[in-house]
A protein has these predicted regions:
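Secondary-structure end/capping motifs
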Residues: 238-314
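Bacterial N-terminal signal peptides
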Residues: 20-31
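Sec/Tat signal peptide C-region and signal peptidase I cleavage site
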Residues: 33-39
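N-terminal secretory signal peptides that target proteins for export/translocation
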Residues: 1-16
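Short, glycine-/small- and polar/acidic-enriched structural segments
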Residues: 41-171, 178-179, 195-201, 224
């Protein structure tokens, strides 16, 4: 029996429908197998106010330019201090952290953070200090006994205070620490609600110039070298070497530019920080901005810091600072 015209039409329609579904399925598989050219990956960068080099790179859009050929976009996330920044890396909120003080990775490691060192800034011992009011009777480190001192927990200034107390034969039991983020520490200090404040630049220089505070001690004379480190999530560092190489190169380049062009750098940062250019230039003079590769030998002070905090029972567990991964650039 010869099929009717309507039957042929239905059969043809059914065949075309099946072929259409097949074409769509193949197209979908192709899309899944081949990344879209415009589907850029996002690198989430955390930074703080003292992250000078990253602040400049963010402002001029340099990282976006050099990472675009790798198919990477950038999102920026500001933190009040280093410890919450590294905590954000550990929980997966950001991928890369701009420079934090040497003490910060030690505390993060004690909390189980899986991080990788990416770069270091050479020592800048005068870029953090213990401040007292100009008229304060506190003249020596021994005079800190019994005093209420503002300090940011886990920051480099925390170690400076510990080291300064030890030099005077004191411990944290001999003082009343007030653990405050930088902005709150400054407010407490200028309001005379604390006897001393341990701060770092640019907060340090800004407060000295504006309130006439006096430096009781900085990191010189072996108290605290104050290196700063750039870190990334360990898994990000393991899988994104090309991106980190690009960032590393820009950090080295920008650090050299800041030291070679202090007035120009201060002018740019003054607008970003809301601080006058003269103050910024003075603060920058305290920093080395010498960015280099991290080495196991160069991390020797990290263990000293960890052991000192453990002895004071500020750090809850013993930390092996050599256990953190170290990413190595192609061209140190």
């Amino acid at each position: 029996m010869t099929p009717s015209f309507s039957g042929l039409r239905r059969a043809r329609s059914s065949h075309l429908a099946r072929r259409g579904v097949l074409v769509m399925a193949l197209a979908l598989l192709g899309a899944l197998a081949t990344p879209r050219a415009d589907a850029a990956e996002t690198l989430r960068i955390g930074y703080q106010k003292s992250s000078t080099l990253i602040a400049l790179l963010k402002s001029n859009g340099e990282l976006e330019k050099v990472l675009a050929p790798l198919g990477i976009k950038v999102s920026w996330h500001e933190f009040s201090s280093g410890l919450p920044l590294l905590e954000a890396i550990n929980i997966g909120s950001i991928d890369f952290g701009a420079d934090v003080a040497d003490t910060v990775p030690v505390f993060a490691q004690a909390a189980g953070a899986k991080l990788a060192y990416v770069a270091e800034e050479a020592a800048s011992p005068s870029a953090q200090a213990i401040l007292v009011a100009t008229a304060s009777p506190t003249r020596t480190l021994a005079d800190l006994k019994g005093k209420k001192i503002a300090v940011t927990k886990g920051a480099g200034s925390h170690y400076l205070l510990l080291s300064a107390l030890a030099k005077a034969g004191l411990t944290f039991k001999d003082i009343t620490p007030a653990y405050l983020p930088p902005a709150d520490g400054r407010t407490a200090f200028v309001s005379n609600n604390v006897d001393a404040w341990v701060a770092w630049d640019p907060f340090l220089t800004s407060t000295i110039r504006q309130s006439g505070a006096r430096v009781l001690a900085d990191g010189s004379d072996g108290l605290a070298s104050y290196k700063r480190y750039y870190l990334a999530a360990a898994d990000y560092a393991a899988g994104h070497g090309d991106a980190l190489d690009v960032i590393y190169g820009k950090l080295v380049e920008t650090g050299k530019w800041v030291k070679a062009n202090p007035a120009a750098a201060a002018g740019q940062l003054a607008a970003l920080w809301g601080i006058d250019a003269a103050t910024v230039e003075e603060a920058n003079s305290h920093r080395s901005y010498q960015v280099g590769a991290v080495t196991a030998a160069g991390l020797s002070e990290q263990q000293k810091i960890a052991d000192a905090f453990l002895a004071e029972r500020v750090l809850p567990v013993k930390v092996d600072t050599s256990a953190l991964a170290i990413w190595t650039p192609k061209a140190p």
